[in-house]
Design a protein with these regions (language model features):
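General beta-strand structural signal in soluble alpha/beta enzymes
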Residues: 29-32, 47-50, 123-127, 141, ...
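Small-aliphatic-rich amphipathic alpha-helix that forms the alpha element of a beta-alpha
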Residues: 66-90, 111-119, 201, 220-225
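Active-site glycine-rich loop that binds ribose-phosphate moieties when present
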Residues: 139-150, 184-201
């Protein structure tokens, strides 16, 4: 693709704004649109990404301890490295806190970031600290991209595979908003997202053609992967793996579990397109649970079926979409 966006983005106001910025930048930018930027340095191929976590948008203090806030913010950034199968190496931390914030809170935020980095083999190598109206955590992550997998590359006939079980973060969010403490498994999925770096390297070794981490919901991020690859897909929604806690809450809300799971964001599980002849081995041998959920097709657009009958999927999360 010509212009600064190498990898086309899916629909949404947030991504319209990114496209508009890229158009204004023109030749002053390059390589935009994927989970990471790729740079050559000292003979190595590096993957670099940056992720913000903002108080009142991504978390509130009523829900999480400071160390959990820090851990979650860093894990979200590091997940971008997993999305391209890069090995985490380094993290730079930008942190803003209110002027009257306690030293203990700042220390716990920093400890959470350090723990998330250490859990996947990255080292904190620098950062910045500032005053602000609320907590903002900005993590820049760097990894070795020896087995680079991007969002683009899915081909007709490929099978779509998702790691883990979905719905936990949305279940936790809705329970907190209702004034209830979430079930432990759902809370853990929200507060301490699991690292999927080993799974990402396994998937890359099994000829993964395209990959993305699920941050805006399975439905939304699948649309991004399809747009990047210039293909379409059918998602077999009854195959979507659902966390039991999420399925229970969906039943209380009179929503189908697959629908609940498909719109749950900030999962940080992996969605990958693999050749059909690799799909069975991927599911059987992946170091974390993995499930085939659909098939890539030549006809563009996302279609969803439940046991063969067409169904509608919710849109993915959009920071500037309609509430």
């Amino acid at each position: 693709m010509t212009g600064p966006i190498d990898t086309p983005l899916g629909p949404g106001k947030e991504f319209d704004r990114i496209r508009a910025m890229a158009a204004r930048w023109g030749a002053r930018a390059r390589g935009l649109g994927d989970d990471c930027a790729f740079l050559e340095a000292g003979g190595e191929r590096l993957a670099v990404s940056l992720d913000l976590s903002v108080e009142g948008v991504h978390f509130t203090r009523e829900w999480l301890a400071p160390a959990e806030i820090g851990y979650r913010a860093a894990a979200a950034a590091l997940s971008d490295l997993a999305a391209v199968a890069a090995e985490p190496v380094a993290l730079l931390l930008g942190l803003a806190v209110p002027a009257g914030e306690s030293d203990d809170t700042v220390s716990q935020l920093a400890d959470g970031v350090a723990d998330a980095a250490a859990d996947c083999g990255a080292t904190i190598v620098g950062g910045d600290l500032s005053r602000g109206p609320g907590i903002v955590i900005d993590c820049c992550v760097i990894g070795r991209a020896s087995a680079e997998v991007r969002r683009r590359g899915a081909r007709p006939g490929d099978r779509l595979v998702v790691t883990g079980a979905l719905g936990g973060p949305l279940a936790a969010l809705l329970e907190w908003r209702a004034g209830r403490e979430p079930p432990p498994a759902a809370r853990e999925r929200f507060a301490r997202p699991a690292s999927r770096h080993a799974a990402a390297r396994f998937l890359a070794a099994h000829r993964a053609r395209a990959m993305i981490d699920i941050s805006d919901g399975l439905a939304g991020d699948l649309r991004h992967l399809l747009a990047a690859s210039g293909v379409g897909a059918t998602l077999e929604v009854e195959r979507i793996p659902v966390l039991p806690d999420a399925a229970k809450l969906a039943a209380r809300l009179k929503e189908k579990p697959w629908s609940f799971a498909a719109r749950s964001g900030e999962e940080y599980e992996l969605l990958v397109a693999v050749p059909a002849d690799e799909a069975a081995a991927v599911v059987a041998e992946c170091p974390v649970p993995a499930t085939i959920v659909g098939t890539v097709e030549a006809e563009q657009g996302l279609r969803a079926t439940e046991r063969g009958a067409a169904v509608r999927l919710a849109d993915g999360f959009d920071h500037f979409g309609t509430p």
